Amino acid sequence: MSRFSAVGVLLICLVSACSDGANDQRTYVLTTGTTGGTFYPVGVALSTLVSARAEEGFSLTAISSAGSMENIKLLRDNQAQFGLILGTFAAWAYDGVGPISTPQPHIRSISAMWPNVEHFVLRSDLVIDGTVSDLAKLKGERYSIGMRNSGAEHTGLYIFDALGVDYTEDLSIAYLGYGPSTNALQDGNIVGMNVPAGPPVTAIARAYALLGEGMTILEFSEEEMAAINQQFPLWDFYELLPGTYPRQDKPVTTAYSSNVFVVRDDVSEEVVYNMTKLLWDNLATLQEIHSATKSMVIEAALKGIPVPLHKGALRYYKENGVEIPEHLLGG
């Protein structure tokens, strides 16, 4: 049994043990991601924390999904009331831009979660300056952007547009998942791949182990960071320290955006306040469940959030002395 499977069984047992006598509570749905990703085990852990505290007056059921795009739809249709989504998708959904053409004004933020780190990989013999703008100089090469309709595809193409990478004319785009991208890079079927995720990423670790100096993670310059933040200030610099991956002996300055915990605006202030309090009061428990959450600190709870806070979350942060950016007010 895998580690996550074992954790899942344990959490389900805990939920069952704590569910007696709670049938009169309002049950909310938290939509997460695929069972093999990070959103799902963290979502299950959150639902377990709620269920273990019947005095909160509500319960939370975590469900798996295809990820951020489906989560937006489930929130829109009120089939889910809470969700974990990429920060880019939160911005697109709220304003109705990019791949989400209709504004979703009902979405509110609870907290930034762990970082979603950009890994734009390129075969080393094609590297010129060592930054992501090198991708604009490729002509006719095959590059993997991620699976179709995935967060990797949409955020990758958004960054390409911001940096002037003509992926329709200059590149031959491949739509491969992370593992298949590593295989294709090793086999010479692609020259690079886009892998946004919380490090260390298994696919990147495998690529380093297989190719070593034959592959490079491209860096972001100040100018490139300004370009991708021009419409939505979502990204910041992230340093991959030496040793993050095997055979990586130098630091890499890349970019990250936050994954965001969101909620519908019609969920009561009291419920969202209690959910926010529960999240931060039990952070150590979440960090035992999944290592991605170990980077979470309340001082960065609002960093990279593009959508106004729910009133319940706003009340919690005010009570705890967290400085609140103006664009997050008015939720």
Please give the residue ranges for each predicted region.
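Bacterial signal peptide processing site
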Residues: 19-21
